[in-house]
Amino acid sequence: LYPGKGYIFQASLDCTLSIKIEKNEFGKLPKVDVDTKLDIHTSTNEQNASWNFVGNPYPCFYDIYHMDFAAPITVWSISNRTYSAYSAADDEFVLMPLQAFFVQKPELVDAITFQPAGRQINKTIDHSALAMRRAARSKQVQRKLVDVALTCADRTDRTRVVVNANASDDFCADNDAVKMMAYEGTPQIYTIAGADQLAVNEGAHCDGSVALGMYLPADDAYTIAVDRDELGVKLLDYGVEVEMPYTFSAAEGYMDDRFTLTFEAPTTGINIVATDADADNAIYTIDGRRVNSTAKKGIYIQNHKKIVK
């Protein structure tokens, strides 16, 4: 087994898997960046292309904020029995020791860099540091998002819409995340973009609306609610505005033509760099994360100017 590479084990019956690890070697991990290469896998369908299964290379917890990687990652939730998408720019999330995740390789990104600063002894997020870095990000890039949750009993799934006037509404692995469906009793929610089902849907969304789709595992009552709303969204049920949280009853199966999110469309461009950002020639990724250099391929902002590598 190799650090940074994800592995899936299949068993024919319930059992416990034990892997022998040399403790002495694990205790000698150097405090250096760990680069995990992302492979290209061609497909006629862009949503199926270049999927990689990546593993936390450290035998400890790891705060994804310190990954030099801005695109969404998709993680299996053991407790909620569903796939969840997270991004270092927008979420607080800590990987478990050796935990693996799915990611689509963005066109201009060749690797994920795990910086040693993300290593932790537990899952606790340093909220004071997080608040400061989020405040810094908000000065660099103006993006607004909403997280919508679908719940039945004690199972919840979520989808995200991000309004970014500089982003294309076409699918882009740098910003968007394909919805990975789970059929283990948890209701599934996603946004619909043409023929695509998305867990994260980032774009200009100039028409001010996004269609919601769902998979309902049983005839039951379900609730739609907003977890995080920077857009002031409204929910339409067959075109009629309803108040959230909103509970409805429905039969088992897919439901892609009933619910719509509406919001005020953006009127100005974004990616506004803070006026004091050039004091130390600070370099930022397109989503506002500060990085040390432009060594890797991508789009950067420095001294109010975009740099394309």
Indicate residue ranges for each PLM-predicted region:
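Compositionally biased Ser/Thr/Gly- and acidic/asparagine-rich
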Residues: 1-278
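C-terminal outer-membrane/trafficking sorting elements
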Residues: 213, 266-309
